[in-house]
Amino acid sequence: MVLRVGTDNAALDWLDDVERARRAAGLRRELRARSEIDRVVDLASNDYLGLVRHPEVVDGAVDAVRRWGGGATGSRLVTGTTSDHELLERELASFVGAESGLVFASGYAANLGAVTALSGQDALIVSDAGCHASLVDACRLSRARVVVAPHADVDFLRRALAERAEERALVLTDSVFSADGDLAPLADMHRVCRDHGAVLLVDEAHGIGVRGRGGRGLVHEMGLAGEPDVVVTATLSKSLASQGGAVLASRKVRAHLIDAARTFIFDTGLAPAAVGAARAALSVLRREPQRATAVLDRARDLARITGAAAPESAVVSVVLGDPEVAVAAAAACRNRGLHVGCFRPPSVPEGTSRLRLTARATIDVAEMAVIESVLAEVLSERRAGVPA
């Protein structure tokens, strides 16, 4: 037995080494609190439809708090389900063309709950290499055999499913990938899944509100809405201007998740304010479907300004390579009144650190002028090697 004697905090001394290594690599992250009135132009948030401060969305949250209180009070299975939760589930399912819906406390929890409940030790999971971290973590927790497929490689998927020994299989993909904004080949993936008896689970976090008729998502756009072997997961925190997540699928899947999804069973239900805000945002989107089209129009404007590839979603990536260059560029934008995202490893592969711009339907002419001026200056400076 080895006896280790040290100071009170010696057990965590290793964190100092980790922090130094992160700083040396340009990968240290810090929090920056927003003020109530932020004077910068926003190209960093996921408020794609510009609904976060919409009066109806704010009123929806306030009204729900007045009727139900500040919290859900318990698990969805005990006291945490209100009639508003059930209304939101039906409204979301109807909007995307699913048979039923189940609301979770976050999009992350929805993915963890759905994947672990629909897999297990006797299943195979094939997960796209570009999947969101929540799906990656779900794979780790699933106890299934996991195969990571090269990004958008349908032939690899076909071979993995054909060669499996497991009776059950679950295929995971984002509809719109968050780093580059590219689209999954959903129609081809579904054909392969149908041929080989696999379930296709699609994370529509960046698809709903942007892709499909009136923002119904890429699954709907590809004609896969309501298919019994397709499970859609979604977040309420992007286009729907709130917080929380949902699984939209068949009634059979919903019933199973209520019994088996641990992130549903053992977590407190979504707060009433978030439910009310999401319902109001969905109502606005139904009434104003042109918001979805406007997001893609603004994304094309951003691509033109930066010289990026024509976008298929709200996400426009400007790859700069080195993480310190990307951080400096983001800081230079901020100092000139423009807030942009900055993606570095492990969010993206080594050597592909980038500015990540997210389009918003409500960007106006004055804001676009600021965007064009600042991005032109900053990108010119970075590419010329001018220090921040």
Q: Where in the sequence are the language-model features?
A:
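Conserved N-terminal alpha-helix of the aminotransferase class I/II PLP-enzyme fold
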Residues: 59, 63-106, 299
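Active-site phosphate-binding strand-loop segment of PLP-dependent enzymes
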Residues: 147-202
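N-terminal "arm"/small-domain region of PLP-dependent enzymes with the aminotransferase-like
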Residues: 3-71, 198
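Structural motif of enzymes handling amino- and sulfur-group chemistry
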Residues: 269-288, 294, 298, 308
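Active-site PLP attachment segment
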Residues: 222-256
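PLP-dependent enzyme catalytic core of the Aspartate aminotransferase-like
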Residues: 51, 55, 59, 63, ...
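Conserved PLP-anchoring active-site segment centered on the Schiff-base-forming lysine
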Residues: 114-133
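Conserved PLP-binding catalytic core of the aspartate aminotransferase-like
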Residues: 294-337, 347, 351-352, 359-361, ...
